[in-house]
């Protein structure tokens, strides 16, 4: 737009503010407007082709791909086409012992959830403890499945054979610090089934930096932890081209309290650190970039910001890969992630059915940002019942309504060119680049984390948010507002029994202890001990990739705790960041 037009708009805007707007404010006795109106003045220097472009083309602001298949769900509803989505068996889940989870997956397969598993592990497993260690007491099988040895993987994967075997379905492992141990188990299990590991597909989370910053299931100090991540990246690039070694995660930092811009910046800074590991190990960035995935940044109820931050993150990532790493393959410029996942911490135990409304808002933001309109988590998440079949059905149906009835996925990047959205996207991007610059000045993600920079920034942001809730400045319906005696407290109920019997969960710990004791009694313990010694020797040599020696230990049924303890003797343990 030329300068004369901008000058005219500026003059007309001033006249509007002084006359039309002021009359409206006076009527309602307001000093300033609670709303904003955007014009070309807010995007004076905006270059559409440079900043937005077209879907599936650099800088990917308008979308990762030139088209999506989500609208085809309408054809599936009419029986014209198969469902393009394959639902993971049980979604994200894991219960009790391997037998319990196997049976649960089979039950869910009977309901049409035929994809591979997205395995939730219990806390002892995530933190490197065997089920028979003192630190594991009371936690075995509680928030996920207990997996101590290859024997547990063998049992769990009895639910995935035939046309669902390891080379025909993908597995996700929500595991971080000990991720290489579980990759080793997956590889050895494939070997035992006669399946070449280059046919395996799946994704371990394996993002140790965000664990140290936000979640806490760390084991080793940062530098040896990054060495383990390097080993994952290199091994997968060389041997398992269909398997993604890392899912770089912003979600958990957002849950910990990071703002949208902080979450974007910290995630990208962590991504830079991980990509640099591969490059420093001698890999061509275009060889492994396509195997690196992202777990969404997480979404708040700030609808417009959540759309803007997704547009900005695609642009930021594309710039990092093209300009910083010199990637030549356009596939390397694409940020691979599932979409906008509504933050579980935004759900409330009070009036839980309101959470479905909140999740629908998140689904709409996801659709308008160019992804599937995932209506998640289920409304009963804060009640500890996020697995209820009623809640899952409502979430699934809400997504179907958004796609099939509302047509939310019919248009790619519907806000493209909007004065408001483009200015907001630019603002979020600029804030993120400022933080990334600060992290670079500190030496990169690892030194910045070691200095406490991430922790302090997230703590400050979390405090500001919580203070807003407690003062009432941040309104949360049914929690700090609209609580009068005339408000109806709507209760929820479960009508369908869950396939996993809670009684089994209560008995899981003893059964798992019995399973582990049996394995340790029947295996060749002398061979296990020797393999653990070889693992320690390998760990002392920085140049050695530890996945092959871990596979050797796994074949002999060494336990996770034994392998972790052997590595602790060489690496030590992470003590955690101190005061803020």
Question: Model-flagged regions — what are they?
Answer:
Residues 109-115, 160-169, 189-200, 234-244, ...:
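Secondary-structure transition/capping motifs at alpha-helix termini
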Residues 110, 114, 119, 123, ...:
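Active-site cavity-forming subdomains of large catalytic enzyme subunits
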Residues 1-151, 158-165, 190-193, 434-441, ...:
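Acidic/polar, glycine-rich intrinsically disordered N-terminal extensions of enzymes
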Residues 207-209, 225-283, 357-436:
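Mobile "lid/hinge" segments at catalytic clefts and subdomain interfaces of large enzymes
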Residues 257-265, 300-312, 341-356, 385-395, ...:
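Short glycine/threonine-rich loop-to-helix capping motif typified by GTGT followed
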């Amino acid at each position: 737009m030329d300068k004369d037009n901008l000058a005219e708009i500026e003059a007309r805007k001033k006249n509007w503010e002084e006359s039309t707007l002021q009359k409206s404010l006076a009527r309602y006795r307001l000093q300033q407007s609670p709303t904003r109106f955007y014009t070309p003045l807010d995007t004076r220097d905006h270059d559409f082709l440079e900043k937005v472009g077209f879907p599936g083309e650099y800088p990917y602001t308008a979308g990762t791909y030139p088209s999506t298949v989500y609208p085809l769900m309408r054809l599936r509803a009419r029986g014209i086409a198969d469902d393009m989505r394959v639902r993971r068996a049980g979604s994200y889940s894991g219960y009790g012992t391997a037998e319990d989870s196997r049976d649960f997956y089979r039950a869910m397969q009977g309901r049409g959830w035929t994809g591979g598993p997205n395995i939730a592990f219990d806390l002892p497993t995530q933190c490197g403890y065997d089920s028979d260690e003192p630190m594991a007491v009371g936690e075995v099988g509680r928030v996920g499945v207990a997996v101590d040895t290859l024997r547990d993987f063998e049992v769990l994967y009895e639910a995935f054979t035939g046309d669902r075997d390891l080379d025909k379905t993908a597995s996700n492992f929500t595991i971080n610090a000990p991720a290489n141990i579980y990759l080793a188990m997956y590889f050895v299990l494939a070997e035992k089934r006669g399946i070449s590991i280059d046919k395996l597909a799946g994704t371990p989370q394996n993002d140790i930096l965000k664990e140290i910053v936000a979640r806490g299931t760390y084991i080793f100090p940062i530098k040896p932890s990054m060495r383990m991540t390097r080993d994952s990246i290199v091994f997968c690039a060389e041997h398992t081209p269909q398997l993604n070694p890392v899912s770089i995660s912003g979600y958990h930092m957002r849950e910990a309290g990071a703002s949208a811009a902080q979450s974007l910046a910290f995630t990208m800074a962590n991504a830079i650190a991980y990509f640099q590991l591969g490059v420093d190990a001698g890999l061509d960035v275009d060889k492994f970039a396509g195997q690196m995935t992202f777990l969404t940044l997480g979404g708040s109820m700030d609808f417009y910001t959540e759309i803007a931050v997704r547009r900005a993150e695609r642009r930021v990532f594309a710039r990092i890969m093209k300009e910083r790493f010199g990637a030549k393959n356009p596939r390397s410029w694409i940020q691979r992630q599932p979409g906008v996942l509504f933050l579980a911490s935004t759900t409330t135990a009070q009036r839980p059915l309101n959470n479905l409304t909140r999740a629908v808002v998140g689904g709409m933001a996801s659709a308008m940002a160019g992804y599937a309109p995932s209506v998640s988590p289920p409304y009963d998440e804060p009640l500890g019942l996020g697995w209820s079949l009623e809640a899952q059905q409502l979430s699934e149906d809400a997504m179907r309504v958004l796609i099939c009835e509302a047509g939310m996925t019919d248009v790619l990047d519907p806000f493209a060119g909007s004065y408001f959205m483009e200015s907001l996207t630019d603002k979020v991007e600029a804030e993120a680049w400022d933080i990334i610059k600060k992290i670079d000045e500190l030496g990169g993600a690892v030194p910045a984390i070691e200095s406490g920079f991430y922790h302090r920034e997230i703590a400050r942001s979390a405090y500001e948010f919580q203070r807003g809730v407690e003062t009432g400045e941040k309104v949360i319906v049914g929690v700090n507002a609209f609580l009068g005696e005339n408000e109806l407290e709507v209760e929820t109920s479960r009508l369908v029994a869950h396939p996993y019997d809670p009684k089994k969960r209560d008995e899981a710990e003893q059964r798992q202890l019995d399973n582990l004791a049996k394995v340790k009694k029947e295996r060749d313990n002398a061979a296990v001990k020797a393999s653990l010694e070889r693992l320690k020797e390998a760990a002392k040599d920085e140049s050695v990739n530890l996945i092959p020696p871990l596979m050797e230990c796994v074949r002999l049924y060494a336990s996770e705790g034994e392998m972790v303890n052997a590595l602790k003797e060489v690496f030590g343990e992470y003590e955690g960041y101190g005061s803020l």
